[in-house]
């Protein structure tokens, strides 16, 4: 048995991935934003992500919004994928099959799902009141109304399969796809209700809907690119109630469709709630019915979603890796949107690499082996780890920043990168103190 996690993956949105610094139009959050940077910055950003992955044992980069007219469309993606392939890194698209713009996220292409819905409004799902199913995203989480398709509509399903065949034929360099059925709610039309048999009628996301399309979608991908990664997003932890049917002794027709998929299929799970609540232990194992597949556990550590962008999450990532390994998964994923110039992001990324290689290592091992050489020694690395908690304790920040100022004098100007990391941390902490003090004064 492998004593490490084989697959290490970055998850990202195109519009909030910022590895090229000081760019106009930079965004730090969102799920449905326009792309506001210069078109050429898209490839420049992701080349730097690829370089990091190549240098630090990361296998792949997933991108939401990969195909978009605003940053070069197919030509830009082919250039990026070619660069990544030369570096031994896989670029894969993250795409909603029934939502999120489909395969071509934004543009005039016929393979942009939004364009298809304009011409085929009968393919949009229905809510409980029989009205079209839309989610109206509000800033900072997006800007546009987003429709959710009807998974029971044959015309829509054929369009989805055709779009997958098209993209993997058009971009042979593409490394795979993370498929999502869409998490904008579930269609409540009579056909969908009958097909689901009420199993997950109250779930915001339907596992039955996933089973209805994932096997056919995977076959469409592999018909054009047999070595492509196909990652089936579940939106759940495998322990969640919505996934209880994976333990059924007598699989439903929906479940059997998933179980019959090839062994090379990936299933992807998320762990944030269970990490933070402690509702995932080393004794918990993947459902036996899924043992033949490959599995990735993703978290939102240090992001716009959980804990805040650029926050230090070393122990959280350690637990993600340890529990994933103990549960029988083979891979882990975190967001890779922030540049490694941001010292906390750098240490989070290094933590994923370190604990994927050594799932039973401790935080103290990481401090000794990884942080200490980059911060001036173990004593200082332990200080950094402690100061990393201060965004949640702003009253301590002035003392911490004073300590950073004093210890910087010990390094002189000989090791630029050590100084850069400490100065970045001081500036990051000061921003939280400034806001805390300003709110308190007002």
Model regions and ranges:
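Short acidic/polar active-site loop segments enriched in Thr and Asp
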Residues: 59-60, 175, 330
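Active-site-adjacent "subsite" loops/lids of carbohydrate-active enzymes
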Residues: 93, 97-166, 292-299, 303, ...
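Mature N-terminal, pre-catalytic/accessory segment of carbohydrate-active enzymes
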Residues: 1-95, 115-117, 122-129, 158-169, ...
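Active-site groove signature of glycoside hydrolases
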Residues: 145-146, 160-199
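Aromatic- and acidic-residue-enriched segments that line the glycan-binding/catalytic groove
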Residues: 25-27, 73-85, 99-143, 188-198, ...
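Substrate-binding groove of N-acetylhexosamine-processing glycoside hydrolases
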Residues: 1-5, 15, 19, 32, ...
């Amino acid at each position: 048995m492998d004593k490490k996690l084989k697959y290490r993956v970055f998850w990202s949105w195109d519009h909030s991935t910022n590895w090229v610094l000081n760019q106009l139009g930079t965004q730090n959050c969102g799920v449905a934003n326009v792309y506001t940077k210069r078109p050429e910055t898209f490839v420049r950003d992701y080349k730097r992500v690829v370089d990091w992955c190549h240098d630090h044992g990361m296998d792949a980069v997933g991108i939401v919004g990969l195909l978009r007219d605003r940053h070069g469309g197919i030509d830009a993606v082919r250039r990026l994928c070619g660069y990544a392939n030369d570096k031994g890194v896989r670029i894969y698209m993250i795409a909603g099959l029934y939502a999120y713009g489909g395969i071509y996220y934004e543009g005039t292409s016929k393979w942009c799902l939004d364009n298809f819905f304009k011409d085929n409004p009968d393919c949009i799902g229905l809510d409980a009141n029989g009205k079209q199913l839309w989610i109206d995203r509000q800033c900072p989480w997006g800007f546009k109304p987003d429709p959710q398709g009807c998974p029971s509509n044959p015309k829509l399903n054929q369009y989805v399969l055709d779009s997958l065949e098209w993209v993997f034929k058009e971009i042979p360099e593409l490394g795979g796809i993370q498929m999502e059925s869409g998490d904008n709610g579930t269609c409540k039309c009579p056909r969908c209700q009958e097909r689901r048999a009420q199993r997950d009628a109250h779930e915001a996301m339907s596992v039955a809907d996933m089973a209805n399309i994932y096997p056919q979608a995977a076959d469409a991908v592999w018909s054009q690119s047999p070595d492509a990664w196909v990652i089936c997003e579940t939106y759940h932890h495998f322990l969640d109630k919505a996934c209880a049917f994976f333990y059924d002794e007598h699989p439903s027709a929906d479940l059997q469709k998933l179980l019959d998929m090839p062994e090379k299929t990936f299933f992807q799970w998320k762990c944030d709630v269970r990490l933070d609540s402690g509702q995932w232990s080393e004794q918990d194992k993947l459902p036996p019915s899924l043992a033949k597949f490959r599995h990735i556990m993703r978290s939102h550590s240090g992001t716009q979603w959980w804990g805040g962008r650029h926050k230090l999450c070393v122990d959280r990532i350690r637990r993600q890796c340890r529990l994933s390994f103990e549960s029988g998964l083979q891979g882990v994923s975190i967001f890779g949107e922030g540049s490694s110039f941001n010292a906390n992001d750098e240490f989070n990324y290094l933590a994923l690499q370190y604990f994927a290689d050594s799932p039973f290592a401790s935080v103290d091992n990481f401090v000794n082996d990884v942080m200490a050489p980059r911060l001036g020694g173990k004593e200082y690395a332990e200080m950094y780890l402690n100061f990393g908690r201060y965004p949640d304790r702003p009253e301590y920040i002035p003392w911490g920043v004073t300590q950073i100022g004093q210890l910087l004098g010990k390094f002189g100007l000989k090791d630029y990168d050590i100084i850069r990391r400490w100065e970045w941390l001081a500036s990051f902490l000061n921003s939280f103190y400034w806001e805390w003090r300003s709110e308190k004064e007002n």
